[in-house]
Structure formats: C-alpha cells, structure tokens
Amino acid sequence: MKKKEIKQLKNEIKIALLNSDVETLSHIGKEGHGFLMKSLRKSVWVSLCGLSCRHRMECLSRSTSQSSYADQNQVHLDSERSFFQYKLNPFLLRKHRSQLTKLLSVVFKHYPELCYYQGLHDIAQILLLTLPFSHALPLMEHLVFYRLRDFMLPTLDGTVKQLQLILAVIKARDPTLYEYLIKADIQCYFALSWLITWFAHDVSDISVVCRLFDFFISSHPLTVVYTCAQVVLDNRTSIIELLWDNSGADLLHSYLCKLPASINVNQLIKNTCATISAVPFSSLPLDRYQISPYSCLRNTGDPWEYMSRSNGLLLFRLQLAELQEEKHKPGTKVPAVFLQENIFNGCNMLAAITVIGIGIVASQLIPKSTSNS
C-alpha cells in the first residue's frame, strides 16, 4: 500500500471506532489490508466482539490463586515452548510465556467444564503479541465461547464434523477437485491445525496471521471452515497434477499440510469471500453433517451481536449435555475415532486429535517396506 492509502485507511478505521460503526469495521476486516497495526487492532477486535468495559473488568478481576485445574501441566508445557518462532529477546519471551500461562489458567479455572486442546495456546499467543493482557484475556474468553467451543468438548465430535465440512465446501465450489480428493482417499486431517488454531500454528509471519484474525473476527465462525477449503481450492492445479503423476495419497497429504506456509493472505481472503458468495452459509448442509444445534457454527446475527443474542457458556453446556446423551443412547454407533476416549481422559481429548493428526503426517515419512532386501 502507498503511504497515502495507509493514512486514509487509518483515518477510516479511527472514525468508525469513534462512531462505534462496527459494520464499517467488519467490512474493512473482510476487505483489502485489514486493520494494519497493533494500536488499531487493540480497539477494533474488542469492538467487533461486542466486549464492554464492564465485561473486561469482570474478566480481569478473576483470581488465579485457587487450586489446580485438569490440564494445568499441559498448559505449562505448551506455554514453555510457545513464541519460539517470533525471535523475541529473553525478557519478552519470559514475559509473554508467563502471561500465556496466566491467561489460560484464568479461563480454565473459572470454567472447569472446558477441555483444553493443544493449539489453543497458538491463538492465545497471537492475542498476547497483539494486545495488552487487559484486552487479550476477555477476548480469549469470548473466542472460547463464541468461536471455538466446538473444539473444547471432551470428545472429538465437534472437531471432526467441522473438518468434514471443509470437504463439503470444496464439493459445492469445485465438484471436479472434490472427486479427485475422494478417489485419492484424502481426508481433511491435513487441515486440523489450520482449523483449530486459525492458521497460527502453520504460518510463521505474524502479520499474515493477524490479517487472518482480522478476517475471522469480522466474520461468521463458518468463515474459518471456508478459508481452510479455499487454501485447497486455490491449489487445485498442483493437486490434480500430483494425482495425475500417481504421487499417491501420502505425498499429496504431505503437500496439503504445507500449503499455508506460502499463502498470499489478501488474495486468499478475497477468494474466500467469493466462495462464500457462490456457496452461501445457508446452503451448507449442517443438518446432514449432524452439526449440533448448539454449535458455534449456528451463530446468528453479526459478530458483535453474539454476546447479546446468546449465552455462550449455556450453549456449551447444552452441547456437552447433548454429547453425553448421545453417547449413552442405546444402539448409537460411535465412530472409531471417538474410541480414543478410552485412552485419553476428558480434557485431553482434543489434544489427542492433534496427536492423531501429527501421527498421520509422521507415518508418511517412514519408508514403506519392500520385498527387496
């Protein structure tokens, strides 16, 4: 962008903030270059989520001094290996890791029914690198209940169903590419980390990740699913060529996993918006994919209205109750992937799916045995 264009966009954002014009802010988040810088994102992200000063103060008043919580050890381990890709000096590294532990501890101590998953810390660290703690904490809590709650259940149910929706979007937008993927027996596990971390785990350039966060926070939760699908759609030619070369599902899966590293973020957002126009959210068969009526994908209204229209904690509890009822229903067929629950206890379930995803990729790096010795 030219200096004149940057200045004009800054002024447009500042005026929208002064006028509480969230519709204009949402439009900017979906178009062009987003919100540009930390100083603007601090106010814009909070405004787009409908977070009041009172709500922020309530979050900050919560204590972290009470007893331990279910996944405290895992949170500590994830915090200790976080921020490494951003080349911070030792002082800032210690500061941010301490803040990350505190932020996640506040959330999980206050809401013990939530299940931590490995990958949530990737989202949290972007918030802490972009916002002061006073803004990052309430925003994290908001995202947990209005954007990420499907991933915070004690089974893989919500996560797997969202992964399946990625293929549904590809099928609706590009049936030919969809058929190629199905014939190659490609599942959407390659997109697992994209989906549950909002690409923060896969993209090392923080400016690109923040631009994606601008887009996602300005939009409906289904936008993340569509963006995952769009990454695949934008690489259809290379994918089909790999299949024509008989490269095999293993090589293709490995190729797909690495796609986010080279995305053109503004072009990706533009193309995703075009796909949303061509395949509206309302046309996506959520019922066919058994998406819970309490899922965040069922949010109605604009993003800044979610808190006033619904109670995220209540919806999470209803989703949890529905899951437990389904689990104990006679004759219910439990997908094989859910049997991992016998191995991983409740709060570790979504960490388990990350392990499963990593295992799928790792297995492709092991040479297959041959008959020659």
Curated annotation (Swiss-Prot):
One function term, GO molecular function aspect = GTPase activator activity
User: Where does it reside?
Assistant: Endoplasmic reticulum membrane
Presence of keyword Endoplasmic reticulum: yes
Domain named Rab-GAP TBC: residues: 35-220
Chief location bin = endoplasmic reticulum
Gene Ontology BP term (one): vesicle-mediated transport
- Note the SMART domains from the entry: TBC (SM00164)
Q: What's in the GO CC field?
A: cytosol; endoplasmic reticulum; endoplasmic reticulum membrane; nucleus
Q: Which UniProt keywords apply?
A: Endoplasmic reticulum, GTPase activation, Membrane, Transmembrane, Transmembrane helix
The membrane topology of this protein is: Single-pass membrane protein
Q: Any transmembrane segments, and where?
A: 343-363
What domain of life is recorded for the organism? Eukaryota
Q: What does this protein do?
A: Has a role in vesicular trafficking and septation during cytokinesis.
Q: What is this protein called?
A: GTPase-activating protein gyp10
Query: Source gene?
Result: gyp10
